[in-house]
């Protein structure tokens, strides 16, 4: 099909082209987060874009399975899947490819996943993730490390108006499973509790043949969110061992997070199950003021690697890079766009000098593009500004002497002639004194 040049080429719903400015911002966010992961001792892993459906589905609940893109493999006849989540891939790799590595394993990744989404929802099908997995440690200290690292990464992006919302799925599951409720009633209640709809919760409970004590424990769940005062209220509702152990766990995690000095960024929500089906203990999500969706989320998943043949406790989380991008776009004081250093504008017929200077600057680590198209000074400067290049170097012409280069600051068109030998010194700085 021939697409007229006057219209935009169509894309499937839920995916986006990211032009250089946005691509720079995404790379900046990913780079900043990756730096934090590496400072905490994590090593990068790269997962494949395709998996066999029957293999990857071992690590997914029904919700993720329904969101998976599938198609036939012409080579094998088997069903292929584009992973909707990277954590099951990590579990497979750890269980089958990293048996010779000692535990604990500290792994991080940058990647993209695809998920089916309702067209009407306006949600993106493509999710950019930067995440970590800590495999082989079953301790509150490991859980606390994930939360503290999430806080540090968000602060490294210049954010301070965020909260990390802590949950504990075993607390919720313990109350639900000990209540005697049917599976259908538990599902209805889970939805109502997630909406903090106490009236709906009471209405559902009135129809259920369970004890009054069980009803009281469940009825309090929509109110179990806020600060640490929530723990005292939750303790009264925890009438089973599983929920009591969950409270002990989150209490110990909070004590460790106090040592990290991140308590001001924390809230607690024990009234619902956050995360995915494979989560099994402490979970958390991060929210930035003014944005309705989570910018990060994760938690403990102690049973996942066992599905691929290697039992090991684990915890981890991932950042939603596009959600963070929305946040940064609302913060004009943050400079996420990557600038380029030089555009080299050559007015001489001989290109040798321009080529040598450009390569010399690149060897010193400066990004340098040559304006190969023949155009005048003003048009080259306009091009540099549009492409977010900081400075333009002019070789030849009447702008300076033969042993000089004319250096122009693109933002305000101010220029100065400098000696070529000064430009090529190892200690050259981009700063121009005008």
Curated annotation (Swiss-Prot):
The entry's keywords: Amino-acid biosynthesis, Cytoplasm, Histidine biosynthesis
Record has Cytoplasm as a keyword: yes
CDD domains the record matches: HisRS-like_core (cd00773)
Pathway where this protein functions: Amino-acid biosynthesis; L-histidine biosynthesis; L-histidine from 5-phospho-alpha-D-ribose 1-diphosphate: step 1/9
Highest taxon above the source species: Bacteria
UniProt-recorded Gene Ontology molecular function terms: histidine-tRNA ligase activity
PROSITE patterns to which the protein is assigned, alphabetical: AA_TRNA_LIGASE_II (PS50862)
Record-linked Pfam families: tRNA-synt_His
Chief location: cytoplasm
Localization annotation: Cytoplasm
GO biological process: histidyl-tRNA aminoacylation; L-histidine biosynthetic process
One term under GO cellular component: cytoplasm
Cystine pairings recorded for this chain: none
Other comment: This function is generally fulfilled by the C-terminal part of HisG, which is missing in some bacteria such as this one.
Role summary: Required for the first step of histidine biosynthesis. May allow the feedback regulation of ATP phosphoribosyltransferase activity by histidine.
Subunit structure as annotated in this protein's UniProt entry: Heteromultimer composed of HisG and HisZ subunits.
UniProt record similarity statement: Belongs to the class-II aminoacyl-tRNA synthetase family. HisZ subfamily.
Protein name: ATP phosphoribosyltransferase regulatory subunit
Gene that this polypeptide is encoded by: hisZ
């Amino acid at each position: 099909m021939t697409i007229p040049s006057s219209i935009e080429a169509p894309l499937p719903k839920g995916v986006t082209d990211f032009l250089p400015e946005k691509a720079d911002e995404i790379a900046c966010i990913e780079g900043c987060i990756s730096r934090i992961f590496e400072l905490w001792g994590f090593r990068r892993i790269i997962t494949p874009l395709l998996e066999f459906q029957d293999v990857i589905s071992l690590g997914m609940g029904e919700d993720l399975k329904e969101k998976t893109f599938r198609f036939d493999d012409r080579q094998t006849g088997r069903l292929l899947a584009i992973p909707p989540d990277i954590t099951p891939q990590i579990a497979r790799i750890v269980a089958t490819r990293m048996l010779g590595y000692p535990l604990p394993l500290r792994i991080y990744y940058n990647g993209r996943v695809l998920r089916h989404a309702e067209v009407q929802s306006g949600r993106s099908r493509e999710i950019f993730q930067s995440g970590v997995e800590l495999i082989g440690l079953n301790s509150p200290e490991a859980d606390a490390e994930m939360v503290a690292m999430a806080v540090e990464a968000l602060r490294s992006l210049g954010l301070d108006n965020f909260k990390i919302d802590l949950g504990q799925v075993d607390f919720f599951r313990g109350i639900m499973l000990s209540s005697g409720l049917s599976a259908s009633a538990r599902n209805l209640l889970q939805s109502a509790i997630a909406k903090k709809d106490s009236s709906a919760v009471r209405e559902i409970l009135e129809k259920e043949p369970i004890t009054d004590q069980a009803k009281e424990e469940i009825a309090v769940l929509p109110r179990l969110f806020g600060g640490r005062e929530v723990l005292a209220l939750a303790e009264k509702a925890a009438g089973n061992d599983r929920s009591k152990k969950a409270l002990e766990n989150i209490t110990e995690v909070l004590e460790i997070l106090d040592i990290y000095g991140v308590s001001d960024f924390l809230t607690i929500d024990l009234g619902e199950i956050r995360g995915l089906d494979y989560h099994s203990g402490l979970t958390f999500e991060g929210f930035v003021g003014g944005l309705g969706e989570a910018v990060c989320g994760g938690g403990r998943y102690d049973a996942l690697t066992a599905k691929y043949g290697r039992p090991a406790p684990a915890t981890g989380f991932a950042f939603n890079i596009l959600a963070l991008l929305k946040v940064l776009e609302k913060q004009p004081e943050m400079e996420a766009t990557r600038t380029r250093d030089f555009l080299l504008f050559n007015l001489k017929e001989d290109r040798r000098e321009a080529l040598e200077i450009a390569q010399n600057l690149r060897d010193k680590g400066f990004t340098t593009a040559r304006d190969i198209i023949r155009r005048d000074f003003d048009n080259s400067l306009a091009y540099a500004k549009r492409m977010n290049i900081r400075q333009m170097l002019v070789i030849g012409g009447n702008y300076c002497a033969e042993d000089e280069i004319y250096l122009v600051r693109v933002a305000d068109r101010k220029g100065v002639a400098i000696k070529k030998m000064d430009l090529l010194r190892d200690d050259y700085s981009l700063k121009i004194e005008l």
